[in-house]
């Protein structure tokens, strides 16, 4: 019994070390010049396996993917399409019947939508905010990876019949994104949405026409408070982004 206990402790420590070693540096502000061409090629080699990535957004997607090491071998297609919702993520329908690790996931990036939502399409966000919302969508995929057929079916039911539960689901997804190290990018996206749409509360594209004080996604003030409560972010007060270029 004692040997088994010690073995369990060792395994836990090794797991924590593995997670720590794969963790990315917390960066407050990414720009198009943050990484060299060689660095982006390295990211593609490490995180681009089983990924279909549109060239237009390749740097942003690769940077976001680098914060989700658990998705290294996951099949994900980033698809450009004209849709009302600026971004969305889901497993392919047949994938619901497969184990989570064998599923193919689709992240749809809208190229055109109605005039009201046009300002928050990915192409109209700044580079840092783009990484933030992509991190949110990858957080969905990471979450889906832990859900079997039953839980995924329940999630579908929630999306159709319970706005309140969807609010909780999206809020939790924002927390997943923050815990993966993209809190500042999520903050940039959250601020950009409210600024670009000239709104105070954001409950998603499908609820834009309704005046409501309910939040589906974390607002900037809440994100700031969450970041302050995380040791991971307290250790970072400022960062010269050019450091990433000098490292290559």
Q: What residues fall within each predicted segment?
A:
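Bacterial Sec-dependent N-terminal signal peptides
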Residues: 1-25
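A metal-dependent hydrolase signature that marks the N-terminal structural subdomain at the beginning
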Residues: 22-100
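Residues that cap or delimit alpha-helices
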Residues: 61, 65, 69, 116, ...
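Active-site scaffold of zinc-dependent metalloenzymes
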Residues: 89-128, 144
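Post-HEXXH active-site segment of zinc metalloproteases
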Residues: 128, 143-171
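Active-site recognition of the HExxH zinc-binding catalytic motif
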Residues: 132-145
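An active-site-proximal "capping" alpha-helix that borders the catalytic cofactor pocket
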Residues: 166-183
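Long, well-structured alpha-helical subdomains associated
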Residues: 179-248
